[in-house]
Amino acid sequence: MELDQVGWRRSRKLCTDNLDQGSKTLETCKNIGGYFKPQGPGTEHINELITGDSIVSAEAVWDHVTMANRELAFKAGDVIKVLDASNKDWWWGQIDDEEGWFPASFVRLWVNQEDGVEEGPSDVQNGHLDPNSDCLCLGRPLQNRDQMRANVINEIMSTERHYIKHLKDICEGYLKQCRKRRDMFSDEQLKVIFGNIEDIYRFQMGFVRDLEKQYNNDDPHLSEIGPCFLEHQDGFWIYSEYCNNHLDACMELSKLMKDSRYQHFFEACRLLQQMIDIAIDGFLLTPVQKICKYPLQLAELLKYTAQDHSDYRYVAAALAVMRNVTQQINERKRRLENIDKIAQWQASVLDWEGEDILDRSSELIYTGEMAWIYQPYGRNQQRVFFLFDHQMVLCKKDLIRRDILYYKGRIDMDKYEVVDIEDGRDDDFNVSMKNAFKLHNKETEEIHLFFAKKLEEKIRWLRAFREERKMVQEDEKIGFEISENQKRQAAMTVRKVSKQKGVNSARSVPPSYPPPQDPLNQGQYLVPDGIAQSQVFEFTEPKRSQSPFWQNFSRLTPFKK
């Protein structure tokens, strides 16, 4: 097998024996054949389709990062319209309005290539399998919808088998060898670099085992694989931990690779395992890419599944499940990327007491200024409130410098329930109420009373509290938490920023506090009721606008006594 054909579709001869035991080796899989190569007649077929006004689409297998003006940059999973494939190594393609050259080895042609369809990520074009060569061919139209579905099924099965091989190579080729070198790697380092890759490998073997049971080898279009995704839907959440840890893994690898010993060691591991010629960070990226490709594959499968097919409703449900999984994983990854900002905000608050925000929280959900009365005192006080997951922090503005905040306490949201109150007089506090709500401690019976300036602001706060509880429940479901390494990294970032500004980190400059914002209109963290999560988040390219609260950090002026 040639090792330089990364990303091209393999032929349809597949090894399945003993796959569930994870014992397949490179030697026993050599019958699989090579990836589909766009060379010779294959390239001519592609150009014939292009010149014949057919649309030829390819999916990016790897990220292509370039600064060259005439090259096309893209990310794994992007769909590229191929405009010219005359050169076997470099093709000319288009994404949206951008055109440019890109390496042919970084993409693979989609399973089906139909003539005369409109371009779009959800469009699948026509192709067929040559029964004599077991290779994917292009150029001959397929009228049989069942054959199209069979092509997609075969593609899913093929990629799953190849993915298992990648995971096996990582676990046995790299991780196993690293554990033998205690002089080079500590347990903590291996945990950071490889995360829970072994858990993913075990889960994926069980998933593929069930897929094989549902696969109809004689009539692939009759296969019912939708139930497999539904049965294993909870298992896919283990990818969240891996994706959240991936940035730390890259940083740790980058530090190690500065030492030539580690470069030679990882290269020796690759050669010993007879792995394809890509660096270890490329292999470790595979699970991240894999989880975000499931919705693409299932959407393609659903398109060619008739509504009267026994698998239709299961595939539709599986597509919804996998979209939700990838969206939630993306959301949690975004939250981890924001923890540096939370740490910087805490460092800017004067007179801070107690545990750090990051010990329990990872997301600023909503912020605003309200009047507040605490039961024992019954005194109306104006405070600025910051609602995080698990807790709400109370701050007071400086009398002269209104952009300076002082820490005044916090409320444990895990112990309180929110009570909406109608306008009128409250007997407990003996005050008239308008736009008010309470936080009631279920254990101690303590009560906090809050007054919003307007009814709309009260509604936003009530919605924010519901969002906070929902977020906590979802985090508990998938075991989301900030690792100690990530907390240390955030603390280091704060010290670095403080040092660059020449300000002591213990009294770093606070941000200018913005007026309360509408989270539904200003790009904050609440999602309006009735708007699908898919309209807000995408796995590979989150489009959430940055909260105006954080943007003030870039406009700070040094604080002087």
Swiss-Prot record:
Q: Where is this region: Disordered?
A: 499-524
Q: Which PROSITE patterns match?
A: DH_2, PH_DOMAIN, SH3
Q: Which GO terms describe its biological process?
A: regulation of postsynaptic specialization assembly
Q: Name one GO molecular function term.
A: guanyl-nucleotide exchange factor activity
- Which species is listed as the source? Bos taurus
| GO CC term, one of those recorded | postsynaptic density
Q: What does this protein do?
A: Acts as a guanine nucleotide exchange factor (GEF) for CDC42. Promotes formation of GPHN clusters.
Asked if the keyword GTP-binding belongs to this entry, the reply reads: no
**Protein name from the UniProt record:** Rho guanine nucleotide exchange factor 9
Keyword vocabulary terms for this entry: Cytoplasm, Guanine-nucleotide releasing factor, Phosphoprotein, SH3 domain, Synapse
Where the record annotates domain PH, the positions are 363-470
A Pfam family (short name) is SH3_2
